[in-house]
Amino acid sequence: MSHLVKMENGQSQTIQEMLGCIERYNPDHLKILESYVQDQAKNNTYDLEANLAVLKLYQFNPHMLNFEITYTILLKCLTNLPHTDFVMAKCLLLPQQMKDENVQTIIDLADILERADFTLFWQRAEVNRTMFRHITGFHDSIRKFVSHVVGTTFQTIKKDLLKELLGGIEDPTLESWIKRNSWKHQGQDLVVVATQDDKIKTKNITEKIEFDNVGALMAQCL
């Protein structure tokens, strides 16, 4: 869905154009930005700059604060881990937002993800599943982050553990994630995450430095 913002002069701009000028701080544009946040949740798209602009407008206009939009923005930030989007969004929250129970729940979920306690995350996510059921692709976005962490942590991993870390998924879903990440089976119970060729190899580099190259510098130090 295309979102156009109508300016005071009667002309229209795209949201991206509006965010590039002083109009981003105009509270008259908040409703259309909030609608844009809802569309991101529905269509599995993401625009961090627009979402941060919404939180900034709430800072300037606390009487216009919308908690449901706040939840959606924070949860969408979680879908873009391991990037630091959530930290930036959290820094823009008002005291009344920070005191909100649902905001605290989302912050707790973020902390759990950041310390890679994925089993606990999925347990908490199940308890709070109504909070993000409107966000298309939420679970798969988290699984993408889990896959990233697994890929940087393990060389091989047991299938049952991998299924647990990915949210207690079934075998067919596991197969799709193995294929997506170019992992491989090893026997019946193991998945190879990193092969020998993937490992970082050390390399000795010898650089020849001529005396003439540093002579002038040494002279200055005398």
UniProtKB/Swiss-Prot annotation:
It comes from the Eukaryota. It holds the Pfam family CSN8_PSD8_EIF3K. InterPro entries: ARM-type_fold, CSN8_PSD8_EIF3K, eIF3k, PCI_dom, Transl_init_fac_sub12_N_euk, WH-like_DNA-bd_sf, WH_DNA-bd_sf. One of its GO terms (biological process) is formation of cytoplasmic translation initiation complex. One of its GO terms (molecular function) is translation initiation factor activity. Component of the eukaryotic translation initiation factor 3 (eIF-3) complex. The eIF-3 complex interacts with pix. HAMAP family: eIF3k (MF_03010). Belongs to the eIF-3 subunit K family. Keywords: Cytoplasm, Initiation factor, Protein biosynthesis. Component of the eukaryotic translation initiation factor 3 (eIF-3) complex, which is involved in protein synthesis of a specialized repertoire of mRNAs and, together with other initiation factors, stimulates binding of mRNA and methionyl-tRNAi to the 40S ribosome. The eIF-3 complex specifically targets and initiates translation of a subset of mRNAs involved in cell proliferation. This is Eukaryotic translation initiation factor 3 subunit K. It is found in: Cytoplasm. GO terms for cellular component: eukaryotic 43S preinitiation complex; eukaryotic 48S preinitiation complex; eukaryotic translation initiation factor 3 complex. Residues 46-208 form the PCI domain.
